From Swiss-Prot:
InterPro entries: AAA+_ATPase, ABC_transporter-like_ATP-bd, ABC_transporter-like_CS, ACT-like_dom_sf, MetN_ABC, MetN_ABC_transporter-like, NIL_domain, P-loop_NTPase
Alphabetical keyword list: Amino-acid transport, ATP-binding, Cell membrane, Membrane, Nucleotide-binding, Translocase, Transport
UniProt keyword Hydrolase present: no
All residue ranges annotated as the ABC transporter domain in the record: 2-241
Subcellular localization: Cell membrane
Family statement: Belongs to the ABC transporter superfamily. Methionine importer (TC 3.A.1.24) family.
Source species of the chain: Staphylococcus aureus (strain bovine RF122 / ET3-1)
Keyword match Acetylation: no
Reaction(s) catalysed (UniProt annotation): L-methionine(out) + ATP + H2O = L-methionine(in) + ADP + phosphate + H(+); D-methionine(out) + ATP + H2O = D-methionine(in) + ADP + phosphate + H(+)
SUPFAM superfamilies named in the record: ACT-like, P-loop containing nucleoside triphosphate hydrolases
Subunit structure of this chain's protein: The complex is composed of two ATP-binding proteins (MetN), two transmembrane proteins (MetI) and a solute-binding protein (MetQ).
Primary role: Part of the ABC transporter complex MetNIQ involved in methionine import. Responsible for energy coupling to the transport system.
Binding site for ATP: G38, F39, S40, G41, A42, G43, K44, S45
Name this protein carries in UniProt: Methionine import ATP-binding protein MetN 2
Record gene name: metN2
Amino acid sequence: MIELKEVVKEYRTKNKEVLAVDHVNLSIRAGSIYGVIGFSGAGKSTLIRMFNHLEAPTSGEVIIDGDHIGQLSKNGLRAKRQKVSMIFQHFNLLWSRTVLKNIMFPLEIAGVPRRRAKQKALELVELVGLKGREKAYPSELSGGQKQRVGIARALANDPTVLLCDEATSALDPQTTDEILDLLLKIREQQNLTIVLITHEMHVIRRICDEVAVMESGKVIEHGPVTQVFENPQHTVTKRFVKEDLNDDFETSLTELEPLEKYAYIVRLVFAGSTTTEPIVSSLSTAYDIKINILEANIKNTKNGTVGFLVLHIPYISSVDFGKFEKELIERQVKMEVLRHG
């Protein structure tokens, strides 16, 4: 269990004070994958570096498995960092060491006997899919392979928490998915708690259980990924979801001719089992109306499917539209009116 209570981080410069993290409260379940998303400058990197005290909070508490991180002694903090490990965007490998020796490095620092350290490193090489590359140097590896070494090294001391600081940002889409699949496998095998920060909604959607959205140092929205993706509340969250959907439909709406009276353009959002139900055809029959599908999209999250439909209804009376909306609510389908005549 990880708890952040009223965490604040301020930086003082010559001319002003910068509030990088602004009274953040979070509760992260043990064994879950928790994502923090935000644009550049939102404060997410500063936030994650306070989990293992690479940054000290100006005020507030960071509590991991009952330990108040800011109250630990030097030796206590050193021991805790072995259990709260971290991987980085640019891998941070030792270029003069082979794959195997990079993975052995934290074990050497921890005083593990060489034979045991080597055996552990070989097991991790196999876990992350690098068997046969033990003697390769970082300069001989692809970006995805380097990140696999980084992950193996981070797992060397059997951590309970893995922090991922933009771990896939330097990778191409296919390699990103491979690394995300590896993180999922590791979480399941080792019951890790994973906290990752990113600016990509695809990453959040693919592996996270819950997400917090940051802007200007504040958490502006948080909750289960499916819920946040299905019903974003804040402008920033809506922008992330829109980018993930590649949705430029609202822009093209302005180019449409004015609608006739009693005509509507609506967006429906489906989740779970409703994504496979023939709702549009049944409503079209029930209300004897024509429904044109202007746009459709389905996205898979780790915990379920979310579907999006944009519909054009050429004519429906106000009374029937009210019934139409009520029936959608009963079927747990969300509706947003984009335009009406």
